[in-house]
Amino acid sequence: MSANREQWLAERRKGIGGSDIAVLLGMSPFRTPVDLWLDKTGRADPVPDNPSMRLGRELEPAVLARYAEQTGRGVSHIGTLVDGIFIANVDALAPGRVVEAKTSRHGWDDVPEWYRAQVMWYLGFFPRVKTGDIAALFLMDGSFHIYPVERDDETIAGMRELATDWWNRYVIADVAPPPMSEADCKALWKSHKAAKTVVAVDGVRESIGKLKELKAEAKRIADEIERHEFAVMREMRDAEILTGPDGKKLASWKQNKDSERVDWQAVAEAMNPPQELIAAN
């Protein structure tokens, strides 16, 4: 990792940036508030650079050049902006516009909400700018699209209030936010303390009881599946295809070395299940 990138990452830890606000809003598919807290408090392992990240940085000038060519607006770079704990790493400014460059393998049916949140966050640094543009290059077909994000001062104020509260409540206080997933729990508590005991509250006792029921049900289902698999295999013997009296294919079983495969989708479809069952699964 280059010294410049290390410095950039260190600066990001000093506050909430555009990609961070989407995490706090629950929009990010990549990180949770626990991930963010571990990062901001210096507890997270450095995220290694990867080919996708490098490609995005390398293509950014090309995306911005395409934007300038298509819109006729010149673009300029301004670097990192800091307003207390609020941080913005804006890709570029154009006349009357904040511009964020994105690359994606495939096109979008709609702009990902975490990108919209990022641009809205950046608009908060420029009171007179009413629109942010997401300039997106799609690598699969080389197409280029511009998606505008209109300023909403109420949303920006809410974002800043949320960021301030979260920063004070968790980063300044050095208290982890509530975990949202099993992965969060593993990240927060990487090892247990021998012989340490906690008393289960009512909700947890209910979960333990439900877990026992579900595991017992899962075992029953697994045993039932195995029983029916055996019945089909025993009937097929060395045949590859099983059909009904009308000749319609019910199942196939191919054995290659030590592997076996039964086409259970074909079995299910041949049994003409009700539409409600299909919809439920």
Model-derived segments and their meaning:
Residues 62, 117-121, 209, 216:
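Short amphipathic alpha-helical face segments that pack within enzyme cores
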Residues 173-200:
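Long, amphipathic alpha-helical segments that form or neighbor coiled-coils/leucine zippers used
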Residues 212, 219-281:
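Extended, charge-rich alpha-helical segments
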Residues 51, 55, 59, 110-111, ...:
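Conserved aromatic-histidine-acidic binding/catalytic patches
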Residues 53, 69-167, 171:
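Nucleic-acid nuclease catalytic cores
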Residues 1-98, 105:
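Metal-dependent nuclease catalytic cores that hydrolyze phosphodiester bonds in DNA/RNA
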Residues 200-210, 214:
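Amphipathic alpha-helical coiled-coil segments and their boundaries
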Residues 35-39, 124, 208, 212:
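Short, hydrophobic/amphipathic alpha-helical patches that form generic packing surfaces
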